[in-house]
Amino acid sequence: MQSLTTALENLLRHLSQEIPATPGIRVIDIPFPLKDAFDALSWLASQQTYPQFYWQQRNGDEEAVVLGAITRFTSLDQAQRFLRQHPEHADLRIWGLNAFDPSQGNLLLPRLEWRRCGGKATLRLTLFSESSLQHDAIQAKEFIATLVSIKPLPGLHLTTTREQHWPDKTGWTQLIELATKTIAEGELDKVVLARATDLHFASPVNAAAMMAASRRLNLNCYHFYMAFDGENAFLGSSPERLWRRRDKALRTEALAGTVANNPDDKQAQQLGEWLMADDKNQRENMLVVEDICQRLQADTQTLDVLPPQVLRLRKVQHLRRCIWTSLNKADDVICLHQLQPTAAVAGLPRDLARQFIARHEPFTREWYAGSAGYLSLQQSEFCVSLRSAKISGNVVRLYAGAGIVRGSDPEQEWQEIDNKAAGLRTLLQME
């Protein structure tokens, strides 16, 4: 770990230079040579400082770990206001989670950020103070002194003691029947209903080890992990982008419509072809496309909807249509509140679907079906926090949802959420 040691020594040298006793922000970037095999997630999980946040873009080109919070924000609106107060730092990134309710968030300006973009990496330390940067530099030195060497992540040697679904299968059937009745009566076009599964284990679950296992096997996904403290974390491997913004250029997508995957390429292709031709799944996907376009229309230029694709994952395949446009102004608050929750995770009409979910789902979604990522003045990117799990000591809560439209069958939808949950669940049964 020569690169890390050298980078930290360079940071300390910068902190030993004269720093003014004035308010403000100072960013120290140290080039980080990728000469040795540095596993950023393992290093992050070795530390005893919280919060910890890990994020990897789904094509693998960008990866980041952030450690410690200089300042925290309970909503993306707050975070964007902060960034706009410091326009000289266009690349200053705030990382974290937005809840299913987009007015709630857990976002942070990190003390330390390691970021890899393609073949280049940087270690960044940020100072921020409303009174004295000099004083914050002293705290930053103390922070660096707490860092420890990397330790290998443990295996997931787990014994299940209990399992509970919310709702159970009977409750699920009743819920789907109520939803399809409501749709038939014209009150809703679609509602996305979810199930939470609590898996109890004989010993605590190492959340970072679970994240590492998922990253290894669940390809073509965003990977995200937030450890709130030593026992509580939220993580996932999501196939779905909520949005990516580069200045005013915006990319989003409709990911809706699902069929099982198969390890055999030929059988997987046949399933994918069936998905492309299936009326129910195409209808479900187009509902999401139309809703996204309608929501963005007032804040964007021309909206381009690309042809449908089949996205093949480890356990399932999805229909995806990408949507590209240009914003009238670079504003992540607009992106969040217009796009989240999309019809792919809530339903249509959105407000009525959210009311149905709040009234009838037997658990609170919290971070599930929210979003994970970062914002800066320059750019931003968030994935939808799907295929996700909440870890609380020795309990793992897995989440999975299904889009309910006219003609949905409770048994088929139960099988679909089993397939979706399997992306993470099978990791806990492998060793």
Swiss-Prot record:
Gene3D superfamilies: Anthranilate synthase. The keyword Aminoacyl-tRNA synthetase does not apply. Mg(2+) binds at E284, E416. Optimum temperature is 37 degrees Celsius. At 60 degrees Celsius the mutase activity is completely lost. GO terms for biological process: menaquinone biosynthetic process. Homodimer. Belongs to the isochorismate synthase family. This is Isochorismate synthase MenF.
